[in-house]
From Swiss-Prot:
GO molecular function: serine-type endopeptidase activity
Locations listed in the record: Secreted
Protein name: Serine protease SplA
GO CC, any one term: extracellular region
Record-linked InterPro entries: Peptidase_S1_PA (IPR009003), Peptidase_S1_PA_chymotrypsin (IPR043504), Peptidase_S1B (IPR008256), Peptidase_S1B_tx (IPR008353), Trypsin_dom (IPR001254), V8_his_AS (IPR028301)
Pfam (any one): Trypsin
Matching SUPFAM superfamilies: Trypsin-like serine proteases (SSF50494)
Location (main, coarse): secreted
Keywords: Hydrolase, Protease, Secreted, Serine protease, Signal
The family this protein is said to belong to: Belongs to the peptidase S1B family.
Organism whose genome encodes this protein: Staphylococcus aureus (strain JH9)
Gene Ontology process terms (BP): proteolysis
Entry EC no(s): 3.4.21.-
Lineage: Bacteria, Bacillati, Bacillota, Bacilli, Bacillales
Alphabetized PANTHER family for the sequence: PROTEASE DO-LIKE 5, CHLOROPLASTIC, SERINE ENDOPROTEASE DEGS
Amino acid sequence: MNKNVMVKGLTALTILTSLGFAENISNQPHSIAKAEKNVKEITDATKAPYNSVVAFAGGTGVVVGKNTIVTNKHIAKSNDIFKNRVAAHYSSKGKGGGNYDVKDIVEYPGKEDLAIVHVHETSTEGLNFNKNVSYTKFAEGAKAKDRISVIGYPKGAQTKYKMFESTGTINHISGTFIEFDAYAQPGNSGSPVLNSKHELIGILYAGSGKDESEKNFGVYFTPQLKEFIQNNIEK
């Protein structure tokens, strides 16, 4: 297995006024490869597992507990230039769960592209975060050939922050590294990787290659990573 994944810069961070994101063009290290293209738009994201997914300006995150979101380090950092705001389960036709200001960020101390984002409980519209989202449960484990889904906001502002779900298969797991063939694009960084029970296996962080035969990559949640996340869920 080659772990030297080429993560390419992008210019995918632009404006969506309804999310309160400022316009900006910036190279961000979250290029996503094409793979198995079983993709559908989620027009109503008010029910689980979709209402646990949040939009950052340049990526995606997933709610795991009270006021607590998991995403990539590079997404949490890049969100600084967008007034530190996230949108709960925004979709093209369904009712969103509000826009929330970020309270703080806790980065995983290891090499893994993993960060915890805490948000203020009350949205800019006066909504309660925890009453408008669901918490995604952790999977006990996963293995090669398991079916998975990836939910997020590919191409972000270019698609007006429509939510999409793609499905595929796990190819390989090694330590905290997971490879799979579910289709993804820029903006899917931080997207939850879920098993068939909608339990959280990990989060997507990168891709490699130029055609649909190439694969995508994620941070696999080992017991150690799950312990880090659980210890940082707001009480």
